[in-house]
Amino acid sequence: MQNLSLSQDVLPKHIAVIMDGNGRWAKAQGKPRVFGHKNGVAAVRKTISTSARLGIKAVTLFAFSSENWRRPEEEVGVLMELFMTVLSTEIKKLHKNNLRLRVIGDKSRFSERLQTKIAQAEQLTASNTGMVVNIAANYGGQWDILQATQALAEKVTQGELQPSDIDEDVFKQHLTMADLPDVDLLIRTSGECRISNFMLWQLAYAEMYFTPVFWPEFDENCLIEAVTWFVNRERRFGCTGEQVKALMEN
């Protein structure tokens, strides 16, 4: 792994990753798409371990979108079984390393067996105090905003909340990652330059890093290159460059 000596103040606190390119990578090898998904697991391990060593507070991995159900039934079935297998084989290592696992998204569509496995994995690591690893599965940014809106509407209906009480902070508290900082750095592999309905609210001020590397080939050095690119960015949050520099000097 490359050396990266940086202050925690300049590192991203929350990294989100759209893990793209498994199918195209497999095709280039003359293999079926599922071969790419299985080989992508190694990149997940590397990303989690490297992020933890860097001191990142949270990593969110886009594993399965709400739109991915449209894929061939066989591929979806393999992805669900792969999810089960990875939960079974990786959770003890995450727990040993004091990492906390959470699965975000609409889990009701998963099989009871998978829902049980998810609940067990989350419960095992719930008290861990290290990096939070979010797996976004059957997740969509529009769904996240919709479920938050429905929850707020229910509170208004029940008289627990007035419409005038709802501001950005209140709304955020009803999103699936309310207790985490918004995303600082979004990484998407495979050369595609879009966010694909991922964390629409939380990406408001994220720096977006697009790499041509297919996900199965994304390693420690690739992640460090992305983080290095991030720390050299000037994040403005709506201010001018001069205003940002003045704030940094104070």
UniProtKB/Swiss-Prot annotation:
Gene Ontology terms, MF aspect? ditrans,polycis-undecaprenyl-diphosphate synthase [(2E,6E)-farnesyl-diphosphate specific] activity; magnesium ion binding
Q: What class of enzyme is it?
A: transferase
Q: Which residues bind Mg(2+)?
A: 20, 207
Q: Which InterPro entries match?
A: UPP_synth-like, UPP_synth-like_CS, UPP_synth-like_sf
EC id: 2.5.1.31
- Any one GO biological process: cell wall organization
Active site per database record: 20, 68 (proton acceptor)
User: What's the cofactor?
Assistant: Mg(2+)
* A Pfam family recorded for this sequence: Prenyltransf
Q: What does the cofactor field's note say?
A: Binds 2 magnesium ions per subunit.
User: GO CC terms on record?
Assistant: cytosol
Keyword Transport assigned to the entry: answer is no
Query: What PROSITE patterns does the record tag this protein with?
Result: UPP_SYNTHASE
Sorted alphabetically, which SUPFAM superfamilies does this protein's record hold?
A: Undecaprenyl diphosphate synthase
Give the binding site residues for substrate: 21-25, 33, 37, 65-67, 69, 71, 188, 194-196
- NCBIfam families on file: PRK14830.1, uppS
According to the record's subunit comment, the protein's assembly and interactions are: Homodimer.
HAMAP family hit by this protein: ISPT
Q: Which family does it belong to?
A: Belongs to the UPP synthase family.
Q: What does this protein do?
A: Catalyzes the sequential condensation of isopentenyl diphosphate (IPP) with (2E,6E)-farnesyl diphosphate (E,E-FPP) to yield (2Z,6Z,10Z,14Z,18Z,22Z,26Z,30Z,34E,38E)-undecaprenyl diphosphate (di-trans,octa-cis-UPP). UPP is the precursor of glycosyl carrier lipid in the biosynthesis of bacterial cell wall polysaccharide components such as peptidoglycan and lipopolysaccharide.
The protein, known as: Ditrans,polycis-undecaprenyl-diphosphate synthase ((2E,6E)-farnesyl-diphosphate specific)
